[in-house]
């Protein structure tokens, strides 16, 4: 891990611990984005390109079309890719600074960006999306919030809609990095989405982070 990334992660840890202690465990998202001052190198998960595994999955499933929702959209690359692929996209994040940053990066975007909370989403979003994308969001939440938040996801799907989740997998290897993120187990994920039909679950590692197990999971309503 390079020194800059290590410093960014250390700052993230300080912010998240302070937020947890203050009883506002998700406050650090806005603090991290605001403190970055539009420098994406200060956001450890900002790839500045669409998630390759999402791109691969969507390309392999041309029958999945229509309205898409990106949960915790970050700097917007996944949402923009989906819009370019023909989806009618809504993308939200808890951080207002993050959403303003998206709007500045993509001023003529077709994506509908909004500041929203997974725990308190607009009623109009229920039963409204053909594809819901969750990448690295559940794993960034402390367990007590995650258990509540994950239950909010399946009702977003229309009948026949697909859920695509990508994140860090807790398997046999003990994570060496401090949390967040908190890697998730396949058992936990499948238990939380047991009211959906499991379509696919596979794990992988990236060449640049061989010590981190990751997963792609898809479910259908």
What feature does the model see in each segment?
Residues 130:
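Conserved acidic residues
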Residues 136, 140:
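Short catalytic micro-motifs in class I SAM-dependent methyltransferases
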Residues 133:
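A conserved beta-strand element that flanks and buttresses the S-adenosyl-L-methionine
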Residues 1-125, 141-221:
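Class I (Rossmann-like) S-adenosyl-L-methionine-dependent methyltransferase catalytic domain
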């Amino acid at each position: 891990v390079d020194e800059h990334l290590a410093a960014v992660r250390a700052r993230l840890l300080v912010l998240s611990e302070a937020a947890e202690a203050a009883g506002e465990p998700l406050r650090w998202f806005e603090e991290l984005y605001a403190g970055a001052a539009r420098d994406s190198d200060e956001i450890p998960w900002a790839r500045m390109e669409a998630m390759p595994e999402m791109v691969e999955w969507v390309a392999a499933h041309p029958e999945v079309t229509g309205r898409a929702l990106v949960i915790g959209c970050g700097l917007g690359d996944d949402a923009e890719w989906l819009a370019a692929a023909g989806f009618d996209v809504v993308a939200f994040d808890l951080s207002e600074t993050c959403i303003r940053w998206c709007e500045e990066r993509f001023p003529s975007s077709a994506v509908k960006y909004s500041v929203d909370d997974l725990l308190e989403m607009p009623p109009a979003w229920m039963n409204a999306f053909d594809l819901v994308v969750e990448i690295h969001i559940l794993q960034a939440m402390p367990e007590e919030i995650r258990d509540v938040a994950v239950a909010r996801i399946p009702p977003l799907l229309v009948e026949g809609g697909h859920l695509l989740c990508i994140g860090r997998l807790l398997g046999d290897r003990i994570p060496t990095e401090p949390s967040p993120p908190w890697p998730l187990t396949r058992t936990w994920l499948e238990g939380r989405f047991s009211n959906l039909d499991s379509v696919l679950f596979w794990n992988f590692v990236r060449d640049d982070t061989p010590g981190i197990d990751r997963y792609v999971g898809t479910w259908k309503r």
